[in-house]
């Protein structure tokens, strides 16, 4: 049991694990609340505070509470169950062509239905492999070979880039006869992003197929152009699953060869999932409103909706409601505390705050400004309550894991504050080594691990040591964030981000630095592609959550800072996933 691995610090008291709804034993405990008072104003020197001028939230409490999907998850449950059985029969139909089955599986995944058919999909892929894999497919079909390669690799089967050699010439370039094969090129392009380190053929295919797709985009019919543009914007394996499902339902609806049963199930399932998301969001909106930080901390971002959107990217499936709620609390607190470090606190105050988090000691913040006390106590009470629930439900003592993650995050925030205050530009390597921690992906994933409820001794040890499964998604998170926010950060006086550090160290232009950052993002994704096939101590739900930590910033930072300064694109994404249901008129 992990509890034996750690020395329990003297800050640990009964209060840490007492639920607010359970009577407290009659012992002498310090009362912890968010009513801490700072010194009287005339005793505290006036400090000029910065302002980031973050725009207010557009998603008001009253608006969120007014959302109503009419309990779609209950209303359509029986109809969806019958459709699900029909689709299951299609997957398990051994008399149909294997390519048809693979295309069905691909459609199921893109429509956000894979979690309903996990065993059936595995059974179908096992059957495909036992039959000879790609050797039972049409050998001259680039689409068939590429699709099978992508699906098998994503599901952890051994496949090799040599499967594509029949389509390449002696120079390693695509044979001319395939260069006008739109479906084949699209499938090969998507498959190439599932490459592992050392797979040069696939690495080269990324660039080559992109050139062909750009050419095809200029000379193809309108219905094909939409699919090509979508793929070129971001490859499928890097997209948020539910956001892709929303887009693909509309695209699939336009296809002449669409399967009516599958399409109807996808629409019902989306609306049912959305109904659950709305209830989760309402719960979190009440929590955030009662916490009161948005009203008390005028300098900080009020981003409850954006934080909840994050959690949909992490785990959208209905069974992960508790996980979404927990992660909404975590990401909301990360946003607040990030602003304490970036905008509000003096360096001396931040040193004290960091020490308090590391010691997990409420007494350590008593001399800090009121808003910093509120921030710490909100963190302290929320995380202790989450730890209490985990101990109660799972019997797992997780305070050491959670507090270490928060302490390491605050240390990384503090390092960035030191660079900013001293106008220091660190080396690129030093920045990235600190930056993947300050991105907060590791904190989110440590909490997600326990919220998903699959614990093992070896995995717990890996959490403490920040296994690569936490590191590489966090690298993508950091670099995507920097690509979107570097200009605003420099305007606030922050000197260190990956772009400025790379420019300064290598004496290159901003354009060249951005190009290099994108290459590093690709490299990180190549590392992550190993998660599905490499032996790890983590279960598939957590592996998928880790990859999702990298998918989300690829979405929200694609065209700007959708977290700090949400724009119309951000609003449209929220609207399409959480607010606007899919019309069932055609169903």
UniProtKB/Swiss-Prot annotation:
Its EC number is 4.2.3.-. This is Probable terpene synthase 12. Its cofactor is Mg(2+). GO terms for biological process: diterpenoid biosynthetic process; hydrocarbon biosynthetic process. A motif (DDXXD motif) lies at residues 338-342. It comes from the Eukaryota. InterPro entries: Isoprenoid_synthase_dom_sf (IPR008949), Terpene_cyclase-like_1_C (IPR034741), Terpene_cyclase_plant_C1 (IPR044814), Terpene_synth_N (IPR001906), Terpene_synth_N_sf (IPR036965), Terpene_synthase-like (IPR050148), Terpene_synthase_metal-bd (IPR005630), Terpenoid_cyclase/PrenylTrfase (IPR008930). Binds 3 Mg(2+) ions per subunit. Probable sesquiterpene synthase. The keyword Methyltransferase does not apply. Mg(2+) 3 binds at residue 489. Belongs to the terpene synthase family. The Asp-Asp-Xaa-Xaa-Asp/Glu (DDXXD/E) motif is important for the catalytic activity, presumably through binding to Mg(2+). GO terms for molecular function: magnesium ion binding; terpene synthase activity. Keywords: Lyase, Magnesium, Metal-binding. Does not produce any detectable product when tested in vitro. Mg(2+) 1 binds at residues 338, 342.
